[in-house]
Amino acid sequence: MKYLVYVALAFVLWFIMFVLKPVNFWISMAFSTSLLSVISFVNYREQLKVSVSMVKEILIGIGSALLLYGVFWLGKFILDNIGIIPNHNAGISNVYANKGLFPPWLIGIMLFFPIGFGEEFFWRGYLQRHLSSKYGNLKSFLITVFFYTAVHIPTLNPVLILAAFLVGMFWGALFIWRKNNIVAPLVSHMVWDPMIFIIFPLN
């Protein structure tokens, strides 16, 4: 049950980052995701071996990032016109509130690596992979989505919590589709983060 210790650590790190905020958010996020990357690497270092299908997986990752951005653009349109979540624009603004803490170019780089890399490498690359060997694809998928969503609940931001649930479902399903190959979800997360936060923000 060692994985539960790592999940508990992620809960603590996310609570510190999003709620306590003792230091600059981006420094805290970079440290947290780097730490989770090290944990994931120690447990599943064979994931980083280059395979002959690497280029294909990278292209799928880039394409899926574009698809996910389109889903969120459509979601923003629905929220604006149907109003499923009251005061959703306040929630979106809160997500982008940390944008002024560093220059945009630096935030974009950090979102690509280590943040996007570290998040995906831990949640899908380590946790979902580890659970799939014990419980199979479906249970590991559902448990990972639950934990990934739950670490965002202390923010009390319904937009962020819903977003975490959706991307957790998306990247978890992509991981299963690619037969537990982490490359496509990894690239997808690394590309999508700076795209939606810096390059083409939805606020």
Segments (PLM) and residue ranges:
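Hydrophobic alpha-helical transmembrane segments
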Residues: 4-8, 13-22, 58-63, 105-109, 138-143, 150-156, 174-176, ...
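Hydrophobic core segments of transmembrane alpha-helices in multi-pass, intramembrane catalytic enzymes
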Residues: 28-36, 111, 163-171
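Juxtamembrane helix-loop-helix connectors linking adjacent transmembrane helices
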Residues: 47-115
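Small-polar-interrupted transmembrane alpha-helices in polytopic inner-membrane proteins
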Residues: 140-152, 168, 190
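Functionally important transmembrane alpha-helices
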Residues: 160-203
